[in-house]
């Protein structure tokens, strides 16, 4: 007799035997014979592309369950796979109805939202569980009860991103999203500015065009160093290549990717760039069981035909594949718990639901399992995944490393900060070239003196260069020293903008500043400082007078050479102007013989030499006994006297300081002593920390000192100090010229004896001199000569000629007598000019 057969002999058939056989056929046989449970999968494919990774994971999970009989010992899991085109919701609905007609316990897929909604509607009507593994935004009035989604809740991921931003203390964040769903996934972060001190700038990647270089260029120009990318792993791989091309793969940037497949990307090109790259990971690779399953997956994938370039590591299991693997296992666990799960054929047009559908759906939502993506539990109300863990990973030189964990209940827990990474910090600078900014300041940084031309770092020497050289030898980095362009240390203006070396560091034009830069609270807000190599405080530094005796020309020291030259030129200029105006104005001509009012001879005291004598006498504060009479000449004299008053006063004050400097004792013992006096001028280095200290100080003594320093210019007494007096002098001379012209016109109109001829009547025949000669009683000679006033020098020459002619005629006619003879003494002729 073969094993497993039942022999019933004739005559032994009784009623009890019949009931026993019926019980065996109805209860014992179904439990011992294998059952078949069919599930359906709808996957989207693209023409001429390999099989979807979700479909491969679907088959891999079914095969793994059938091989391991511990989960479903008496059930064989089979599947039906249907492939559709992308975004074809009608084809998705038709394929779903075909699978339901075959009799499936659950439907998996598709991925995209339009097709998912169509399949979900059918499953909800026929009460068949719908298993989803992609992110899907639930509607407000969600009435879909027959589905679960293994993808983490978008609200939880958004909170995780916000917690990470707060942990890093980012004040400005740039969010770059691929499509509109990214704004929904990050809504917690977008609403953060209303609750936290965070500024968010939102940008969108170009749709359809993978060239993001223009966008990256704007971000680089705008100094956007903290960037969050919400995109797929395919887009992330392409963006990383363009970031490297744009020169933005440096330690100054921090990129965060919301994709859960950052660990699966090939990041070999960026490991040693120093860039900060962070992301999430859902796979629990720390579990040995998970690691073994991932290793089996990798072995199968490496044996498969090569896939096109996707930016992923070879044979790696993505999050999509892991979620599909866990989804199949969740259905298998629920079916194992269900006793007598009978799957019937369903017709979409009949709208007759599956009788065991609600019970099976509840079993799936109640299932608990630690899968590839960690602990899996569902919310019974909306079917979303809850209470999951997200690993925080960061790119290091060794690859991606776990630096923390985020849980939907406990929040963020960073573990990287507690690790001793001193060795990594030391090694991170090896074989790197740093741009070092500095400033010329003896003895810290100086130009090296050499007969040969020097280039690069050899141009400089000093304490800071020696310190930098020692650090380079210890840490193994290279450096390129550059002087700060504006020659300043770094201070903040009223607009909050920085200059000097601080600005070079903020703008990342330099990696390091090695200089005698003071550590202040304001500077520490924007840049980081190392341990100080020297501890100093604010000190009063003043020059001790040297012991040299005054030289022969020490009296010239109070004024700069430019001032001395301008004073001499001003003296010459004023003298010439005074001479011309005195000749031009009629009020400077006077009668030398006041006893003879009928005399037509007039004289002028302001010859060229007398004008120079007047200017020199006023400059020496002595006078010259020459007093101007006309208003124009008095204006010239008054302006010149005012000019000499300022010059001589300034000279006297500075001369006393120069001569007594050796006898001065130190009157400054504290800041209060310095603030109380005004004789000794003082200041600080422009845009340095000392200047900023006095500028921002609220202490009355320091405020008074800052007011004094800001009102003084750190220069000698030169043109910029007393140059205004030269402007006053020039304005006075111009005014005197106009006044002289007015005086001449006024006198011309008033004198009715002057003949006016033509248009030149104001300037011609100003003087009309009459000389009458009387002979004897019977003879008389009258000579009348009119002088033309074409030019002043011509007039003076004619006057001298007439004088000689009169003398000659008086010798030829002895009987002649003069009624009026105008003669000038020879000595007066030399000093004064006479017009007859």
Curated annotation (Swiss-Prot):
Membrane association type: Multi-pass membrane protein
Chain ranges passing through the membrane: 562-582, 639-659, 722-742
Extracellular side: 31-561, 660-721
Protein keywords: Cell membrane, Glycoprotein, Ion channel, Ion transport, Ligand-gated ion channel, Membrane, Postsynaptic cell membrane, Receptor, Signal, Synapse, Transmembrane, Transmembrane helix, Transport
Keyword Membrane listed: yes
Recorded catalytic activity of this chain's protein: Ca(2+)(in) = Ca(2+)(out)
Any GO CC annotation of this UniProt entry: postsynaptic membrane
Side of membrane Cytoplasmic, spans: 583-638, 743-836
Signal peptide residue numbers: 1-30
Glycosylated residue positions: 68, 74, 276, 379, 413, 424, 431, 546
Pfam families per record: ANF_receptor, Lig_chan, Lig_chan-Glu_bd
Compartments it resides in: Cell membrane; Postsynaptic cell membrane
GO-annotated molecular function: glutamate-gated calcium ion channel activity; kainate selective glutamate receptor activity; L-glutamate transmembrane transporter activity
A biological-process GO annotation: regulation of membrane potential
Tissue expression notes: Most abundant in the cerebellum. Also present in the suprachiasmatic nuclei of the hypothalamus.
Residues given in the record as L-glutamate binding sites: 516, 518, 523, 689-690
Additional facts recorded: The postsynaptic actions of Glu are mediated by a variety of receptors that are named according to their selective agonists. This receptor binds domoate > kainate > L-glutamate = quisqualate > CNQX = DNQX > AMPA > dihydrokainate > NMDA.
Assembly and binders: Homotetramer or heterotetramer of pore-forming glutamate receptor subunits. Tetramers may be formed by the dimerization of dimers. Can form functional heteromeric receptors with GRIK4 and GRIK5. Interacts with KLHL17.
Function description: Ionotropic glutamate receptor that functions as a cation-permeable ligand-gated ion channel, gated by L-glutamate and the glutamatergic agonist kainic acid. L-glutamate acts as an excitatory neurotransmitter at many synapses in the central nervous system. Binding of the excitatory neurotransmitter L-glutamate induces a conformation change, leading to the opening of the cation channel, and thereby converts the chemical signal to an electrical impulse. The receptor then desensitizes rapidly and enters a transient inactive state, characterized by the presence of bound agonist.
Assigned protein family: Belongs to the glutamate-gated ion channel (TC 1.A.10.1) family. GRIK1 subfamily.
Protein name: Glutamate receptor ionotropic, kainate 1
Organism: Mus musculus (Mouse)
Top-level taxonomy: Eukaryota, Metazoa, Chordata, Craniata, Vertebrata
């Amino acid at each position: 007799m073969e094993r497993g057969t039942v022999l019933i002999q004739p005559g032994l058939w009784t009623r009890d035997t019949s009931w026993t056989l019926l019980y065996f056929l109805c209860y014992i046989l179904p439990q011992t014979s294998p059952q078949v449970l069919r599930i359906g999968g709808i996957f989207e494919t693209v023409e001429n592309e390999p099989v979807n990774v979700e479909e491969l994971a679907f088959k891999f999970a079914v095969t793994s369950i059938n091989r391991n009989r511990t989960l479903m010992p008496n059930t064989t899991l089979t599947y039906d796979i249907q492939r559709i085109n992308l975004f074809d919701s009608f084809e998705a609905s038709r394929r779903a109805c075909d699978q339901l007609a075959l009799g499936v316990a659950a439907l998996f897929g598709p991925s995209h939202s339009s097709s998912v909604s169509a399949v979900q509607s059918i499953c909800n009507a026929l009460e068949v569980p719908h298993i989803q593994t992609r992110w899907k935004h639930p509607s407000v009035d969600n009435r879909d009860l027959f589905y679960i989604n293994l993808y983490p809740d978008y609200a939880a991921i958004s909170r995780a991103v916000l917690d990470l931003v707060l942990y890093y203390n980012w004040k400005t964040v740039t969010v770059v999203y691929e499509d509109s769903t990214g704004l929904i996934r990050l809504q917690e972060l977008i609403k953060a500015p209303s609750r936290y001190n965070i500024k968010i700038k939102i940008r969108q990647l170009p749709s359809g065009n993978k060239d993001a270089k223009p966008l990256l260029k704007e971000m680089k120009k705008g100094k956007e160093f903290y960037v969050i990318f919400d995109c797929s792993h395919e887009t992330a791989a392409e963006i990383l290549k363009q970031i490297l091309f744009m020169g933005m793969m440096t330690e100054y940037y921090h990129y965060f990717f919301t994709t859960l497949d950052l660990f699966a990307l090939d990041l070999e090109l960026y490991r040693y760039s120093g860039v900060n790259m962070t992301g999430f990971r859902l796979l629990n690779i720390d579990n040995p069981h998970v690691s073994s399953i991932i290793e089996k997956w990798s072995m199968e994938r490496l044996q498969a035909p090569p896939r096109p370039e996707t930016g992923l590591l070879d044979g790696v299991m993505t999050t999509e594949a892991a979620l599909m693997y866990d989804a199949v296992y969740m259905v298998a666990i629920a079916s194992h718990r269900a006793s007598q799960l009978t799957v019937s054929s369903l017709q979409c047009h009949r709208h007759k639901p599956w009788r065991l559908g609600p019970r099976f759906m509840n079993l799936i939502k109640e299932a608990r399992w630690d899968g590839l993506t960690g602990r899996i539990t569902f919310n019974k109300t909306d079917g979303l995944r809850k209470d999951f863990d997200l690993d925080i990973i960061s790119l290091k030189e060794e690859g991606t490393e776990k630096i923390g964990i985020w849980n939907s209940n406990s929040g963020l827990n960073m573990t990287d900060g507690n690790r001793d990474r001193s060795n990594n910090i030391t090694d991170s600078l090896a074989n790197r070239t740093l741009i070092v900014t500095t400033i010329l300041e003896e003895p810290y940084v100086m130009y090296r003196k050499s007969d040969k031309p020097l280039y690069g770092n050899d141009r400089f020497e000093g304490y800071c260069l020696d310190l930098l050289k020692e650090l380079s030898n210890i840490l193994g980095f290279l450096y390129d020293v550059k002087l700060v362009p504006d020659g300043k240390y770094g201070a903040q203006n009223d607009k909050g903008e920085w200059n000097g070396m601080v600005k070079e560091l903020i703008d990342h034009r330099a990696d390091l500043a090695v200089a005698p830069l003071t550590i202040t609270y304001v500077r520490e807000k924007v840049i980081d400082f190392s341990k100080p190599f020297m501890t100093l405080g604010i000190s009063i530094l003043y020059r001790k007078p040297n012991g040299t005796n005054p030289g022969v020309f020490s009296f010239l020291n109070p004024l700069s050479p430019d001032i001395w030259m301008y004073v001499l030129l001003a003296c010459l200029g004023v003298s010439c102007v005074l001479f011309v105006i005195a000749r031009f104005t009629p009020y400077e001509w006077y009668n030398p013989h006041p006893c003879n009012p009928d005399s037509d001879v007039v004289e002028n005291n302001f010859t060229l030499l007398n004008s120079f004598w007047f200017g020199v006498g006023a400059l020496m504060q002595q006078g010259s006994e020459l007093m101007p009479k006309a208003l124009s000449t008095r204006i010239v004299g008054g302006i010149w006297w005012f000019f000499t008053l300022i010059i001589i006063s300034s000279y006297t004050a500075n001369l006393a300081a120069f001569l007594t400097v050796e006898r001065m004792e130190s009157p400054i013992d504290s800041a209060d002593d310095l603030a109380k006096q005004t004789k000794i001028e003082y200041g600080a280095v422009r845009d340095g920390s000392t200047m900023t200290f006095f500028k921002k100080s609220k202490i009355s003594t320091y405020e008074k000192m800052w007011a004094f320093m800001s009102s003084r210019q750190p220069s000698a007494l030169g043109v910029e100090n007393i140059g205004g007096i030269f402007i006053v002098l020039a304005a006075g001379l111009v005014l005197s010229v106009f006044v002289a012209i007015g005086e001449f016109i006024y006198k011309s109109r008033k004198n009715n004896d002057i003949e006016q001829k033509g248009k030149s009547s104001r300037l011609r025949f100003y003087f009309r001199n009459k000389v009458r000669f009387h002979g004897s009683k019977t003879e008389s000679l009258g000579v009348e000569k009119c002088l033309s006033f074409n030019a002043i020098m011509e007039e003076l020459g004619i006057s001298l000629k007439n004088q000689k002619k009169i003398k000659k005629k008086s010798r030829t006619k002895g009987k002649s007598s003069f009624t009026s003879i105008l003669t000038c003494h020879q000595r007066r002729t030399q000093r004064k000019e006479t017009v007859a």
